[in-house]
Structures are given as C-alpha cells and as structure tokens.
Amino acid sequence: MGFTSYSGPASAFPGKGTWKDFDTIFNLNKPEMLQTGDSGEDVGRIYNAVKEAAKEVGVEERVIFCIIMQESTGNVGVGTTIDPGSHPTGGLMQAEKSPAFPGQHNLSQEQISSMVTAGTKHFKANLKQLDDQDTATTIYRALRLYNSGSIDESNLSDGQGATPSYVSDIANRLQGRTN
C-alpha cells in the first residue's frame, strides 16, 4: 500500500481510529529493519526499548516506533546528522543529545534503550509545548515541532527548512504503511 499525501492543519490528518496497533506496525516493519544490518536481537531490543520508553515517558508506543522508522529505518547504527538549527542529532530517533552508535550493530539493550528514551523525552517535550494531550491532532502538531522546531498550524506540511512530508509520512506509518 503506497503512501497518501496529507497536508493542512492537524484536523486534516487521519484520526487515531485509522491507526494500526503497535504489534502490527512493528511486525510490518521488521523486514526493513533487518535490511539495515540490524541483527534479530537488535530488532527485539528496539521492541523492548519502545515498550519501556512508552511506559516511562508517557508517549504512545506506535508514535515512538513510527518516529524511529521515519528517522533511522530502525538502524541501530545510523549516523549522526545535523538539524536545521545546526545541532547534532543522533540515535534511532535522530534526537539532539541522544547517544548514538554509528556503524555498530548487535548493541546491548541498555544502548538501544538509551537512544529510544532520549528521543522519546525530546518528543514528550514537544507535546508539552502544546497541550500534552494524547490526541491525534496534538501528536501531529508535536511531530512537526520534533522535525522542524517550529509549526505552521495551518499547514503541517510546511517543513520550514526541514522535511515537508514528515508528519504525512508518519501518519501513513501509523496506518501500517511501509517504505
């Protein structure tokens, strides 16, 4: 199933009722994660790390995992990049101040969890900048902040120097679509 393009305000994006459950989304993406060089153990540890971070930080598992897939394709050894504000962003969620292990695989649970927790805390801070509600519209708005650091409420596909399709791509991933 191909990606559908969404744009406009958060209300124009698909509601939570269209989102697949975490296990379904995770299992649909396993083949893609394994193609990055991740071991089966790495993939299992990503699953555990998402569950842990969701419980510890208070962000939905499926949102955390879809950010991981959008940012790094689940590659535990993904390289560090530079965000629009010229800050290094690393790890599975490409978050500022996240631990990163470029080029490495077969990581420990602690290493993988550290990346997922750092990114999840960063996203939670974006949620708190808004109304910290567990609604699709707040999550979509926070995703725009996570990716670009700012938000045009009238058009979440205005990347303002970052990836324009970021929120739309994650909306698709939440519905079970893969690359």
Over which residues does each language-model region extend?
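Glycine-rich His-Gly loop
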Residues: S72
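Short, surface-exposed glycine/acidic/tryptophan-bearing loops
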Residues: G79-P102
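Aromatic/hydrophobic pocket-lining residues that form π-stacking "cages" and hydrophobic walls in ligand
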Residues: V50
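Helix N-cap / loop-to-helix initiation motif
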Residues: V59-E61
